[in-house]
Amino acid sequence: MKNNKLGLRIGIVGGGISGVALALELCRYSHIQVQLFEAAPAFGEVGAGVSFGPNAVRAIVGLGLGEAYLQVADRTSEPWEDVWFEWRRGSDASYLGATIAPGVGQSSVHRADFIDALVTHLPEGIAQFGKRATQVEQQGGEVQVLFTDGTEYRCDLLIGADGIKSALRSHVLEGQGLAPQVPRFSGTCAYRGMVDSLHLREAYRAHGIDEHLVDVPQMYLGLDGHILTFPVRNGGIINVVAFISDRSEPKPTWPADAPWVREASQREMLDAFAGWGDAARALLECIPAPTLWALHDLAELPGYVHGRVVLIGDAAHAMLPHQGAGAGQGLEDAYFLARLLGDTQADAGNLAELLEAYDDLRRPRACRVQQTSWETGELYELRDPVVGANEQLLGENLATRFDWLWNHDLDTDLAEARARLGWEHGGGGALRQG
């Protein structure tokens, strides 16, 4: 086994979930020097609740973050603990079926809580703040990244985990002779809010609505709209996201000068869901001040790597949230790279082959998740060209639709990567002492 005595210098740009998770794992290895650069003055995640499928939970555990996750994660109470979502007709909350995720169910967390739990384990000196990347140069096997504050960092490998508006993505694509890819508006907006679960129970009692709808994750489906709920913060808060889509234009646009997130009124939200049933309306009436999110994603990229710069997470494959899979794909990226880079057989001499394996093995799966996330939104909103509003077909489709996504064996991909690299086994790196 070859040990790189000089070590690998690795920079990570972006302090979201995937960037922090990767930094936490890499800093454990004595042959790696890692620095994490975050543009904001402190760690923090925009958004509210986020759910993770079984594949994402396996990646979290594989990255050594299972304990931190369980401290803040929620799961549906017994006997519904394996339910991912129950599916209901938006007009009257009639039951259409359920999707079961054995052993995991609806595993969810408040984004900020998860980041807070992770960063408490990050060693001092790893993270630097106020570091917005502005330029990247590569020369002689070394990467130089420049920041808007005038500082720079040099490393053997630069990892772009800087989200859908990534500054590093243009460097990667231009290096491949391709035009930059900018986020595209999906035509769907989402009203978001957090509801006190006791308040929601009272509202449902007043309307004669079954309180079971509070206890179990729900998805209400309707034409050009859907509403989801799931508990966070030990069931005390219900995360609510109400999606509404305008399909009048084949290529919708969002005004360049308009924010992606803005405050909205309850009246605006209720008007968008006029004609929906009592359960949906009573739920939305519990949100006095929703925020409106314009949902963007990326086109599938032809490559995630240029030289010694690599993209992960939303920087590489930002997707619509309809499979609850975006954060999970970033964590799969982090797990895949951590397992390879953390091996002492990894060194500056085989980084190119290692990154090629990452691109070849991770990109097709991530692209498929991107595409099916869009298709799933069409299904939820009764616009699937085959299923349409056929409730029997809808229930049958949703019962098994996510199996391929959740049951994927990432370790099989890693075994193939090691075989390509000529590594006979998955030898781990030497752990840093102290």
From Swiss-Prot:
Its EC number is 1.14.13.1. GO terms for biological process: catabolic process; secondary metabolite biosynthetic process. Keywords: Aromatic hydrocarbons catabolism, FAD, Flavoprotein, Monooxygenase, NAD, Oxidoreductase, Plasmid. FAD binds at residues 9-38. One of its GO terms (molecular function) is salicylate 1-monooxygenase activity. Monomer. This is Salicylate hydroxylase. It comes from Pseudomonas putida. The lineage of its organism: Bacteria, Pseudomonadati, Pseudomonadota, Gammaproteobacteria, Pseudomonadales. The gene is nahG.
